[in-house]
């Protein structure tokens, strides 16, 4: 299944706020579809919905998300927590959380078009896994800086998670450490996502 490129508002009406996909939010009490079924069907629907929220927020294909679930499942820690850490430490998501891009698709474009450096080297792979002490910057030219300027100016410094810092004048971000669960930027029950995939095998 390919990455979703359709109407974004359609997805947030069904799944709720997906800040990585779009800055728009569904109206209070709008069409967040709540069809109640009995027993197993309702439980399956809830698990599927949580999985879809995770996939669309981070802009992943079904295959990519499944691969992350498998990697997380091999860790000694909680599978759900490791899954969120893997997704949050992707370069495209780090750019989004730093405020250098307004959405994850926008961050992905910055990376694909070679505007972003990690520790002084161009990285053009959005899924690149960042680690503590990594320094993320734009290329030292006006075009690259201009592309992130508006996003930084309109971002809310109060929403910057504690595992990141940013120098807005130099367009430079720092990954201080692996994030804690409470800093994840999406309202999600990751255990239901893990359960969804465990029941598919």
Swiss-Prot record:
Q: Which family does it belong to?
A: Belongs to the universal ribosomal protein uS4 family.
Record bears the keyword 4Fe-4S: no
This protein's GO cellular component annotations are: chloroplast; plastid; small ribosomal subunit
Q: Where is this region: Disordered?
A: 20-39
For this entry, the protein name equals: Small ribosomal subunit protein uS4c
Q: Where is the S4 RNA-binding domain?
A: 89-150
InterPro entries from the entry? Ribosomal_uS4 (IPR022801), Ribosomal_uS4_bac-type (IPR005709), Ribosomal_uS4_CS (IPR018079), Ribosomal_uS4_N (IPR001912), S4_RNA-bd (IPR002942), S4_RNA-bd_sf (IPR036986)
Q: Which SUPFAM superfamilies match?
A: Alpha-L RNA-binding motif (SSF55174)
Q: Which GO molecular function terms does the record list?
A: rRNA binding; structural constituent of ribosome
- Which GO biological-process labels does this protein carry? ribosomal small subunit biogenesis; translation
Cited function:
One of the primary rRNA binding proteins, it binds directly to 16S rRNA where it nucleates assembly of the body of the 30S subunit.
**Subcellular locations according to the entry:** Plastid, Chloroplast
- Main location (coarse class): plastid
- Describe the protein's quaternary organization and the partners it interacts with: Part of the 30S ribosomal subunit. Contacts protein S5. The interaction surface between S4 and S5 is involved in control of translational fidelity.
Q: Which UniProt keywords apply?
A: Chloroplast, Plastid, Ribonucleoprotein, Ribosomal protein, RNA-binding, rRNA-binding
């Amino acid at each position: 299944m390919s990455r979703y490129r359709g109407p974004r508002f359609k997805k947030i009406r069904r799944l709720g706020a997906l800040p990585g996909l779009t800055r728009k939010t569904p109206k209070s009490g709008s069409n967040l579809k709540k069809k109640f079924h009995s027993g197993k069907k309702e439980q399956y629907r809830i698990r599927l919905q949580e999985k879809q929220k995770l996939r669309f927020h981070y802009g992943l294909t079904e295959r990519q998300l499944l691969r992350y679930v498998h990697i997380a499942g091999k860790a000694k820690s909680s599978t759900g927590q490791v899954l969120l850490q893997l997704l949050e430490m992707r370069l495209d998501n780090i750019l989004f959380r730093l405020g250098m891009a307004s959405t994850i698709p926008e961050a992905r474009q910055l990376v694909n078009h070679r505007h972003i450096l990690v520790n002084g080297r161009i990285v053009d792979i959005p899924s690149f896994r960042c680690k503590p002490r990594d320094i993320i910057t734009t290329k030292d030219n006006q075009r690259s800086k201009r592309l992130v300027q508006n996003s930084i100016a309109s971002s809310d410094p109060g929403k910057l998670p504690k595992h990141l810092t940013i120098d807005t004048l130099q367009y430079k971000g720092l990954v201080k450490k692996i994030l804690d669960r409470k800093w994840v930027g999406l309202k999600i029950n990751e255990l239901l996502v893990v359960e969804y995939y465990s029941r598919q095998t």
